[in-house]
């Protein structure tokens, strides 16, 4: 029984690590992603594609609701990525 519980615990920890991509800053995220979210829960998210939610780029690289758009797209006044 102890072995089964240990295996389940290790499996759950491994799954949480795979799913969670928490970040503290842009440097924690891979290419094509930004660090976005609330002060307490930031995650690496992909840059916005055409028609997706976005936030304009800023010099501090701090984003709360979404990432900037992918290259060749711009974030419109309604916070959606569109062709530049």
UniProtKB/Swiss-Prot annotation:
Major localisation: secreted
Tissue expression summary: Expressed by the venom gland.
Superkingdom as given in the UniProt entry: Eukaryota
InterPro entries named among the record's database cross-references: Prokineticin_domain (IPR023569)
Compartments, record wording: Secreted
Gene Ontology CC: one annotated term: extracellular region
Pfam families xref list: Prokineticin
Disulfide bond annotation, renumbered to this chain: 23-35, 29-44, 34-67, 54-75, 69-81
Signal peptide: 1-21
Molecular function terms from GO: toxin activity
Protein keywords: Disulfide bond, Secreted, Signal, Toxin
UniProt family annotation: Belongs to the AVIT (prokineticin) family.
Protein name, entry field: U8-theraphotoxin-Hhn1c 2
Organism (species): Cyriopagopus hainanus (Chinese bird spider)
Organism ancestry: Eukaryota, Metazoa, Ecdysozoa, Arthropoda, Chelicerata
